[in-house]
């Protein structure tokens, strides 16, 4: 895992966009974002059970698995959104990026690799993108998992 401030430069979302300003796991924790590294799925299962999770799904984000829907799905995952419940994301292989909003409204990018697990708190704005490889991402959720609209859309409604 590597966390840093997103550079906000234009270009492919699947590139690192590393500003060079590192963010510690302690700073992530202050945002409510928790990081773990579990090489054993039994440890993931135990954490999920301890936190009251009952449901899970897995999605493989790749052109081979998604076919013609791939580009649209990658763009959809990168739309800023939040959930009413906490969620766990565990990377079984490959690499992906989670961007989470900091308290001062900037993006913090968290690069996750195989066996990395991230817990996102309820109500945090976030988005996800793969790198250019195929990434299976099990999503472990407590109950229903509905994405609420992004900040720009929510502001427009109010």
UniProtKB/Swiss-Prot annotation:
Fe(2+) binds at residues 81, 83, 87, 126. Keywords: Amino-acid biosynthesis, Cytoplasm, Dioxygenase, Iron, Metal-binding, Methionine biosynthesis, Nickel, Nucleus, Oxidoreductase. The keyword Lyase does not apply. The keyword Magnesium does not apply. Pathway: Amino-acid biosynthesis; L-methionine biosynthesis via salvage pathway; L-methionine from S-methyl-5-thio-alpha-D-ribose 1-phosphate: step 5/6. Its main location: cytoplasm. Its cofactor is Fe(2+); Ni(2+). GO terms for molecular function: acireductone dioxygenase (Ni2+-requiring) activity; acireductone dioxygenase [iron(II)-requiring] activity; iron ion binding; nickel cation binding. Its EC number is 1.13.11.54, 1.13.11.53. GO terms for biological process: L-methionine salvage from methylthioadenosine. InterPro entries: ARD, ARD_euk, RmlC-like_jellyroll, RmlC_Cupin_sf. It is found in: Cytoplasm; Nucleus. It holds the Pfam family ARD. One of its GO terms (cellular component) is nucleus. Binds either 1 Fe or Ni cation per monomer. Iron-binding promotes an acireductone dioxygenase reaction producing 2-keto-4-methylthiobutyrate, while nickel-binding promotes an acireductone dioxygenase reaction producing 3-(methylsulfanyl)propanoate. It catalyses: 1,2-dihydroxy-5-(methylsulfanyl)pent-1-en-3-one + O2 = 4-methylsulfanyl-2-oxobutanoate + formate + 2 H(+); 1,2-dihydroxy-5-(methylsulfanyl)pent-1-en-3-one + O2 = 3-(methylsulfanyl)propanoate + CO + formate + 2 H(+). Ni(2+) binds at residues 81, 83, 87, 126. Belongs to the acireductone dioxygenase (ARD) family. Catalyzes 2 different reactions between oxygen and the acireductone 1,2-dihydroxy-3-keto-5-methylthiopentene (DHK-MTPene) depending upon the metal bound in the active site. Fe-containing acireductone dioxygenase (Fe-ARD) produces formate and 2-keto-4-methylthiobutyrate (KMTB), the alpha-ketoacid precursor of methionine in the methionine recycle pathway. Ni-containing acireductone dioxygenase (Ni-ARD) produces methylthiopropionate, carbon monoxide and formate, and does not lie on the methionine recycle pathway. This is Acireductone dioxygenase. The lineage of its organism: Eukaryota, Fungi, Dikarya, Ascomycota, Pezizomycotina. The gene is ADI1.
């Amino acid at each position: 895992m590597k966390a840093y401030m997103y550079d906000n430069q234009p270009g492919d979302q699947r590139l690192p966009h590393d500003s060079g300003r590192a963010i510690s796991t302690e700073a992530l924790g202050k945002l409510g974002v928790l990081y773990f590294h579990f090489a054993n799925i039994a440890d993931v299962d135990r954490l999920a059970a301890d936190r009251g999770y009952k449901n899970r799904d897995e999605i493989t984000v790749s052109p081979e698995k998604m076919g013609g829907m791939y580009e649209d799905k990658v763009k959809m995952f990168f739309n800023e959104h939040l959930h009413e419940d906490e969620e766990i994301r565990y990377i079984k292989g490959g690499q992906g990026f989670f961007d989470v909003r900091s308290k001062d409204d900037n993006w913090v990018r968290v690069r996750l690799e195989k066996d990395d697990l991230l817990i996102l708190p309820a109500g945090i704005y976030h988005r996800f993108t793969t790198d250019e490889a195929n990434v299976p991402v099990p999503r472990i959720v407590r109950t229903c998992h509905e994405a609420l609209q992004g900040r720009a859309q929510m502001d427009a409604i109010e």
